[in-house]
């Protein structure tokens, strides 16, 4: 089947927002208008089309980003619905990596909320052009102008309204289009129909003021228009469109629109703006990668280039097994063909290709450059792998994922389910790179680790529902680490001579505190240790560092210099030097003032003014450091750094202290030293 839509008629967009800002509802409405859904799903009823996992429908939050294809005015739009809960930021990172642009949805009552900032920062990292849709204009307390101000203050973004609302709360009727200078009034019932009329008298001055501000912001990004504007010439609608599109794609301007998805107002105009101002795959820089010799290469969005595709998500489907969601950057992927997974250097056969609608799928023969779809039948591909033409290998830049910060022990309720649980956990870990599972060497328990309590709750929930594994879960454990404070020199000597061949390994090392990755420096001169044994010393040290001397936690933030040693012509072996390296490390660590480190979280708590004192007192009692307080939309925002170990069950505490009105979000900040009294307790419990 030939390509249906040319590349310039493609839009790959993400929809991102704070939890509950109305993201899934907005996506639903887009699917409704573009003819993909016949009945609109309501999140309240647990029937939204995009939220297709059972847990999402129950909790009313979006967990897995479903990629959906829809059509509007001769354009193909691929939408990725991203989760808004902070425990799932990896899903957001992954989606942003493969999008060309995004719509940020704000709640008109709250404006920019904590998670909006997190997601916005991630979008900045990938330089994703954005538009803002101020949603829920019909609810009590909705304030469009305050919301726009929060974008400028908190996100430091150049937010430029291209619409302003007519009325608010129950009286919200539509908006003024500042480019056409017309009022758009929606039908009261379903909002599907609307009329373009003259601007109401009482809004004319405001519309003029905001139109002037919009034009000034646009001409600042275009010298020719600036000259025209300064000379007092009229700037045409066409010129505004062209300049605004250019400025949006260059991340110089963020256009702001308004509406209410739930009442169907403003979605058609949002779709028009997506086509008008957001980039097609041709408008964004070509993707860079490296070839097999390590040289940088570019892949352009064209069907004629060799295939270059990125697997950005792996999902397990109950009917077809493993689905790999891919973005085709260049070339064409054919079903039934063979491709190279360049990260693993293995050939893969493309089984079937499907384009996804939220939860039904359409089989296709080919996926073209610029498209998003899913592949069935890949054996070795995991998240972040590149699939390419074997005659033109390339590795597209891979994604970095944060390390898990919280872990729990888990065991099946029956012995029979042990193997089933192992298979299920392996499948879940394949889908989600921030979820790890391993067996504790000392206790033999299976441990699962992730990004937060909700993350692990949902994993356990999925084990029970999708894989029918009933399990018991232990109390959450913090991922402590150990490090050293002083530099020391230490000796490791392993000698065994008792009949037959002996063992002899001997090294001197210097352990040095060092922020950053582990480094090993070979400073041996004069062959005190033969070259072939040096890697064994390094391996011995790295293995010993997996389990520190305080509580058996991994040791981080140090580097090693191996500067002397001795060997025996006959008795020395790699094994002996590995043991010597391990002994030297343990001896050195004991003398280097070892300390315990704990993960500290950056916490943001939003509470009504009257609960401020109570909540701050509670944060202090949790060893929290309060960094600042800012008023926001009638509430106070407390920014603090709090050790993760003190945050377990915090959601319940905050709810009871604020009568359910407080919310919080947290993300990993860094590792910090644990106070001595607490460190002794932690180590005591672990021994």
UniProtKB/Swiss-Prot annotation:
CDD domains: EF-G, EFG_III, EFG_mtEFG1_IV, EFG_mtEFG_C, EFG_mtEFG_II
Keyword terms, alphabetized: Cytoplasm, Elongation factor, GTP-binding, Nucleotide-binding, Protein biosynthesis
SMART domains: EFG_C, EFG_IV
Locations listed in the record: Cytoplasm
GO molecular-function term, one example from the UniProt record: translation elongation factor activity
Species, as recorded: Clostridium novyi (strain NT)
Protein name per its UniProtKB record: Elongation factor G
Chief localisation class: cytoplasm
BP-aspect Gene Ontology terms: ribosome disassembly
Encoding gene, per UniProt annotation: fusA
GO cellular component: cytoplasm
Entry similarity comment: Belongs to the TRAFAC class translation factor GTPase superfamily. Classic translation factor GTPase family. EF-G/EF-2 subfamily.
Domain of life: Bacteria
tr-type G domain segment(s): 8-282
The protein's role, per its UniProt record: Catalyzes the GTP-dependent ribosomal translocation step during translation elongation. During this step, the ribosome changes from the pre-translocational (PRE) to the post-translocational (POST) state as the newly formed A-site-bound peptidyl-tRNA and P-site-bound deacylated tRNA move to the P and E sites, respectively. Catalyzes the coordinated movement of the two tRNA molecules, the mRNA and conformational changes in the ribosome.
Positions bound to GTP: 17-24, 81-85, 135-138
Coiled coil residues, start to end: none
